[in-house]
């Protein structure tokens, strides 16, 4: 039905958090539409722009799994759940490698990948 509101879950998949496959099963079983993982491959040595949450970056920024690997693991254990990057930092990536990862994840997930992109906040 047009106009139906759909809800998703976003979290930092980190080495100390719930594993992506277990989280994906829980999210799908509870009827959510989507699961979103961010990308944080580069920790700035210095910052000209403040992080909006305070002075220090939270622990999860230092321990975040690669979103394509984590979403691939989530895709392997789900059937309907849409899987997205929230967001992929495309300006920090090789475009050919990124295109290959996006196409692979979308194909292996049966077309369930949602490609959220951005540039990040640090100047």
Please place each PLM-identified region on the residue numbering.
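Conserved catalytic cysteine-centered active-site region
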Residues: 78-86
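Hydrophobic residues within beta-strands of alpha/beta enzymes
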Residues: 35, 83, 113-115
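Short secondary-structure transition/capping motifs
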Residues: 59-63, 87-94
């Amino acid at each position: 039905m047009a106009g139906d509101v759909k809800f998703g879950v976003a979290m930092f998949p980190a080495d100390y958090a719930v594993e992506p496959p277990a989280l994906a099963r829980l999210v799908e079983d509870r009827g959510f539409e989507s699961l979103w993982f961010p990308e944080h491959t580069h920790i700035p040595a210095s910052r000209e722009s403040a992080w909006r949450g305070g002075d220090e970056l939270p622990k999860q920024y230092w321990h975040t799994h690669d979103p394509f690997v984590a979403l691939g693991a989530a895709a392997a254990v789900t059937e309907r759940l849409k899987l997205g990057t929230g967001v992929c930092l495309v300006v920090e990536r090789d475009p050919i490698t990124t295109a290959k990862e996006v196409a692979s994840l979308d194909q292996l997930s049966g077309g369930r990948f949602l490609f959220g992109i951005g540039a990040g906040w640090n100047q």
